[in-house]
Amino acid sequence: MILKAKHNFIIYPFFKWYAGFIIRRHSSNVKIIGEFKDRNLPVLLISNHISWWDGFWAMYINQNVLHRKFHFMMLEEQLRKYWFFNFTGGFSVNKSTKSIVDTLIYTSDLLTDKENMVLIFPQGEIQSLHNQSIQFERGLERILRNKENAVQVVFLVNLIDYFSNPKPGIYFHIREYTEGAFDLKSIQQNYTEFYADSVGKQMTFNQ
C-alpha cells in the first residue's frame, strides 16, 4: 500500500517558504535559464538527481516558474523516516514490491489534474552531476503510456559553479519536451542532449 501525497495547511506552506529561504542562504546566486510556456496542463518535471538539495531546488522552480501543486516520488523507507515530506506532496515508491505498479498508476492519476505537477528523478538514485549519460528507468514510460489527457513534460538540469565565490551559484536549465513521442528512448535521448547543451551553455558563464 502506497503512502499518498498530502498537503498539510501548516507544513506545506512552511516547506514552500523554507525552500526559498535555505536556497538563498546557501548560494551566491540563483539563475533560471530557459523558458516555460504555461499551457494550462498538468506538468511532469523530469530532473537530474545530483544531491540532497534536488527536492528544494524543484520546489523553487515550481514556486517561481510552474505554479502548480507540488508532488514528488520518494522511496518508502525514506518517506517513513522523514514523515513530514508526506505532508508536502511526497508519495511513496517501493521498488521491491508489487506496489510499484500502484505508485505508477497513482502518479499517472495525479497527472490528470491541470493544477498538479509531479517531480521525478528518472535515474532512480543520486549520481554525479558530471555524468551526462543518464539512464532512465522504465517507470517513466509506464506513467505516460496511453494517457488520455495531455501532459506538459518539462526538463530540468541542475548545475552548480563557484567561480570566485565561497558559496555556489545554482543554475536551473529548463526546457519543455515537445517531440511528442512518450517512449523511453525518445525522452532519454532528448534529455541527454539537453543536458549536454546545458553544460555547454554553463561554460560560457563567469559568475
Feature annotation, model-predicted:
Residues M1-S27, R80-T88:
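Alpha-helical membrane-targeting segments
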Residues I2-L3, L104-Q207:
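Non-catalytic C-terminal accessory region of glycerolipid acyltransferases
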Residues I10, F14-F15, K98-T103, F136:
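Soluble or luminal CAZymes and related metallo-dependent hydrolases
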Residues Y12-P13, W17-H49:
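Helix-to-loop junction immediately C-terminal to a conserved catalytic motif
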Residues G20-H26, N94-S99, H130-Q132:
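Short, flexible loop segments at the rims of nucleotide/cofactor-binding pockets, characterized by
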Residues I23, D54-W57, G139-I143:
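Short amphipathic alpha-helical face segments that pack within enzyme cores
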Residues H26-K31, K98-Y106:
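Glycine-rich, highly charged phosphate/nucleotide-binding loops
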Residues R39-T97:
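Catalytic core of membrane glycerolipid acyltransferases/transacylases, capturing the structured
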